[in-house]
Curated annotation (Swiss-Prot):
This is Ribonuclease Z. It catalyses: Endonucleolytic cleavage of RNA, removing extra 3' nucleotides from tRNA precursor, generating 3' termini of tRNAs. A 3'-hydroxy group is left at the tRNA terminus and a 5'-phosphoryl group is left at the trailer molecule. The gene is rnz. Belongs to the RNase Z family. It comes from Chlamydia trachomatis serovar D (strain ATCC VR-885 / DSM 19411 / UW-3/Cx). Keywords: Endonuclease, Hydrolase, Metal-binding, Nuclease, tRNA processing, Zinc. Signal peptide: none annotated. It holds the Pfam family Lactamase_B. Zn(2+) 1 binds at residues 63, 65, 141, 208.
Amino acid sequence: MSYRGLTILGCSSQQPTRHRNHGAYLLRWNGEGLLFDPGEGTQRQFIYANIAPTVVSRIFISHFHGDHCLGLGSMLMRLNLDRVLHPIHCYYPASGKKYFDRLRYSTIYHETIKVIEHPIDREGIVEDFGNFRIESRQLDHLVDTLGWRITEPDTTKFIPEKIKAAGLKGPIMQELINKGQVKVNDTIVHLDDVSYTRKGDSIAVVADSLPCQAIVDLARNARILLCESTYLEEHSHLAKSHYHMTAKQAAEQAKRAEVQQLILTHFSARYNTTEEFVQEAGEIFPNVFAAEEFCSYEFPKNPS
C-alpha cells in the first residue's frame, strides 16, 4: 500500500522565523504528491524533510500573496533540473494567471517538463479522475483565494461469508461488479446483497480566510482539515482586519464541519510557540494539532 500522509514543510504566515519557514504542505496519497502553497524556501525544506522533490505531481496555489506562492518558481525549476517524466499539474485562481506566469518564468532555465495549468474560475468539482476528486471553494480573504478538498473514490468491499453463501466465485464476480447483479442457480444476487461501500477519505485545505460557510461545506466530514489560524483570540481584531482566523475560529469551523482531525497552521511571526493555539482550539475541538515543520500526519486506510 502506498504511503498516505501529510508532511508539513513550513507553517509560518507572512514572515518566516528562525523556527518556522513560509508555509508549504505535501500530501502523499495514492501514489501522487500534492504540494499546497509552496512559500519561499520550499525547495530547501524538501532536503531537510529527506523527501525527493520529484514526488510532486500536482501543485495547488490558494492565492498569490507571496507566502503562499514564492516557492513555485524554484520548485518548477528543480523539477526541470531533475527531468521528471510525469506531468506537473498546477491549480490556481484564474484571476492570478499573470502572477503564475511571472513566477514560472521569473528566471532563465531550460524547460524539460510538461506543466499542465488549471486556472480555476468556478467553484465545485475541478477534476474527477481515478485517484481523486478535486473540489474548490472561494474563501473570504482580501484577494481571490481558493480552498481545496481532495477525495478518494469510494470502494466496494465484499463480505466473504455472503459471497460464499451465494455461491459466487471466479469470472462471475467481475460480472457482478460490472452489472450490479448476476443470476446464480436461478437466484438473482445483487451487489448490495454481498458487499458494502467504504467511503473514500477526504482532506480539506483552507488557507487565508475569515470564518465562512464555504469552509464548513468544503471540510464536511473530512478525515483531516488543515486550516489557517494566524492569531490567538486575544488578537482577534487583527484577524478580522487582515481577513484571517484565530485558533478558536478554526476550531469552530472544524466542529461545524464534523471533521475527524484539525491541524492548525499559518502562524503569525509574533508567536514564538504554538502551545496556546492547541489549548485555545482544544476547548472547542479536542482532536487538534499545531503544525510542526517536518512532522508527518499519517492516515492509514481504514480496513473496514
